[in-house]
């Protein structure tokens, strides 16, 4: 997980275009058979992508979150901008097809992503923020 620190508003107004891109642009987010995550100290948001092609991908907390599992103290929204896919949340299977979305509530432990067809893989765009209350997981069609 890449970690980005907050920038001072006084400093940002003097950044060049190249410096703005260096500090704020997220590149190469969608990579085959990987989950890529970028943690920003601005609002403690995590932006990411999961692109399962040949294998099922499991979402893990990593050392940066200092949590037992990714959504221990967070919630997550996702949208599938690729081919049809499957998201499994704590054993419950959701068929998340192209342009479908999901809200996954705080406390969800085991989350995996997979594609139905490797020749047209699912591409899950993810956003996660801190959560103080658990709400139920919802599939948005």
Language-model features and meaning:
Residues 90-106:
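Short acidic-glycine-tyrosine-enriched beta hairpin
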């Amino acid at each position: 997980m890449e970690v980005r620190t907050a920038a001072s508003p006084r400093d940002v107004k003097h950044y060049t275009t190249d410096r703005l891109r260096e500090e704020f642009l997220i590149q190469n987010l969608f990579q085959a058979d990987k989950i890529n995550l970028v943690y920003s100290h601005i609002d403690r948001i995590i932006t990411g992508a999961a692109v399962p092609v040949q294998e099922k991908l499991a979402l893990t907390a990593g050392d940066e979150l200092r949590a037992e599992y990714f959504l221990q103290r967070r919630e997550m929204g996702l949208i599938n901008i690729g081919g049809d896919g499957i998201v499994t949340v704590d054993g419950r299977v959701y068929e998340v097809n192209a342009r479908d979305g999901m809200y996954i509530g705080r406390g969800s432990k085991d989350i995996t992503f997979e594609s139905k067809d490797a020749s047209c893989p699912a591409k899950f765009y993810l956003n996660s923020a801190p959560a103080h209350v658990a709400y139920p997981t919802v599939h948005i069609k």
